A protein has these predicted regions:
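Non-catalytic interaction/Regulatory regions outside core domains
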Residues: 1-135
């Protein structure tokens, strides 16, 4: 059986211009698995990326919006962020919560030569492999 790191490696190997892939625990911010081919993606850098992803999906800002929506709608709204695509001057970041594991996030980082559709397709296909491996 493959490990989370093996699946992350397969994502990076299969997608043109992929730089790295990771799986993050949204409760703790800990990396559950990672693979990259960029020398400056150090452990501390990857930890910072994981923490930023947690903030985007479960941070105070989104929690505040979800609380307000809950009040307006009269029903609980939580963990509403499912996918985010972020663009920086040189990279694309694809982030998706694993549907059956609502506290686990899969992340793909590519260069700008990557096709956006292929990035999403590759990450979503890998999620099926990641689901049984994640806590």
């Amino acid at each position: 059986m493959a490990s989370i790191n093996d699946v992350c490696k397969a994502i990076v190997d299969d997608i043109d211009d992929a730089l790295g892939a990771a799986v993050v625990d949204l409760n703790t911010g800990l990396l559950l698995g990672v693979h990259h081919n960029v020398p400056y993606f150090t452990t501390s850098f990857m930890d910072a990326v994981a923490a930023a992803a947690v903030e985007m999906f479960r941070g105070k800002g989104i929690s505040s919006v979800e609380k307000r929506l809950s009040q307006i709608r009269g029903e609980t709204v939580s963990n509403s962020m499912q996918e985010v695509q972020m663009t920086t001057p040189k990279t694309y970041h694809f982030m998706s919560v694993i549907p059956t594991k609502p506290n686990v996030l899969a992340i793909l980082i590519t260069g700008k030569q990557a096709n956006l559709g292929m990035g999403w397709s590759g990450l979503r296909a890998a999620i099926e492999e990641l689901e049984p491996l994640c806590p």
